[in-house]
Amino acid sequence: MTLVSIITNALATIGRSTDAQSMDAWKQKFTIFANDGAKDLAHYLQLRRTDTITATDNQIDINDLPFDCEKVVSVKQNGSDLSFTRGNASNKINVGVNGDVEVEYRYLPKDMADDIDQPGIPEHLHHLIIPYVVFKEHMTADPNTQRRADMYWQDYDKGRRDAKKTYGEEDTYKIYNAGWF
């Protein structure tokens, strides 16, 4: 789903026209809301990706990763796990080796700006951004309109809670004691 389709669907949901003039009037505000929604989903679901970067002086710089890094989960070189610690600066991590390493990390998507940009989250989650945008719009309106915001928040929140069951870190999984054999 592209940014323009997110904005168009959000405008239709709140009962506004989706002509070119309306799109221009609402684009900046709804783009901010859509970017906030994509980042909220990525943070809540603890979305991960793995990218290869080069370690120099036994350190990696998380600014070399293509997306904003919330947390480094693992570092590997040639398929072997590496231990890692904080480096000598807030953006450095000691990995104890030089060369290319694969970094698995929790990320935040890049901001959308152009009409054809897509949220940097899995495609099947894109539809959740629309109720988030509508929720944010209702929350910035008059008190009568704010009362309707809860309905859109519930729709968004249910979708992200349902998605949480299949995303995230190990703390989302449970191990049950099956007893002694």
Segments the model singles out, each with a brief description of its role:
Residues T13-S17, Y44, K110:
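A short secondary-structure junction motif
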Residues G15, D57-Q59, E104:
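Short secondary-structure boundary micro-motifs
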